[in-house]
Amino acid sequence: MQEEEHKKFIDVERLIGEKNPKALKWTPRFLINYLKRKLHQDEINRTLAENKHLQDYDFCNNIIDRFEINVISSGVENIPLEGGAIFVVNHPLGGMDALSIIHSIGNYRQDVKFIVNDILLSLKNLRGIFAGINKHGANSKDSLHALEELFSSNKAIFIFPAGLVSRRINKKVEDLEWKKTFISRAKKYNKTVVPVHLDGELSKFFYNLANFRTKLGIKMNIEMLYLADELYKQKNTTIRITYGEPIPASHFNQSKKDIEWAQWVKKQVYLLKDKEKN
């Protein structure tokens, strides 16, 4: 039984215990149970256990089917069918963004690599597709080198330049500032950049909590604890993905700084939303 516990992808009590054993001892049981429910601990662990034999594209397709999500892709003629390219995507839905993108792109390319955060790197079902930097691990330098090699490869690389799920600001759901990494790597390795727009929103609760937390000056992203709950709210929905025209690396000249080019590409991504409506 103890061995099975350590195989759980989500284990609230173990996570708290590893971070602060004293905190686990004094944390009220009702709070632990609340976190388990909001993180959908049992449901996610059960789903992963039932699908442990599925990897990468097959796993994503299975999850999309389980959630009865209809993924509609447009602009697929803009997808480079071979050669290295960096696909940059807005990040409105959290984990379902990557799953739906992989489900969509799998019909055109089987050499996809998705750059994700530390936590998702431990998801074994997608270890053939997910890549990233374990910032807190002993091999962080090695993973950084591996990521550099990835950008120089001929693979289809997907990245969320914002690094965070979109927020609602001035009644508009949009990514925060995009990081410039994809611009600098596109220039360094002469890679085409493909803008991709994913249409969707989370609940009002998520955005209100994020804004309230920000107004209080709390730096910890408390709202991230609710992303699993938001994931399950996306059952029986339609997700629209639009691939824009590829942008050659030569376009990113000296007329703008890399960070400015990143925001320019971000604007092009959101302009694709208007094309979705037409």
PLM regions and their residue ranges:
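Membrane-anchoring hydrophobic helices of lipid-metabolizing enzymes
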Residues: M1-A85, A98-S100, N107-R109, R127, ...
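Non-catalytic C-terminal accessory region of glycerolipid acyltransferases
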Residues: Q2, K8, V12-E13, K141-N278
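Catalytic core of membrane glycerolipid acyltransferases/transacylases, capturing the structured
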Residues: Q41-E43, A85-A138
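Short, flexible loop segments at the rims of nucleotide/cofactor-binding pockets, characterized by
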Residues: A49, N62-E68, I133-N139, K171-K172
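Short gly/ser/thr-rich secondary-structure transition/capping motifs
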Residues: F67-S73, N139-K141, E223-L225
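Hydrophobic beta-strand scaffold residues
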Residues: V71, V112-F114, I157, V193
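Conserved beta-strand termini and adjacent loop/short-helix elements that scaffold enzyme active sites
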Residues: S74-V76, I115-N117, I133-N134, G244-P246
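Residue-level detector of flexible, active-site-proximal loop/helix-junction positions
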Residues: N78, I119-L121, G137, G200-L202, ...
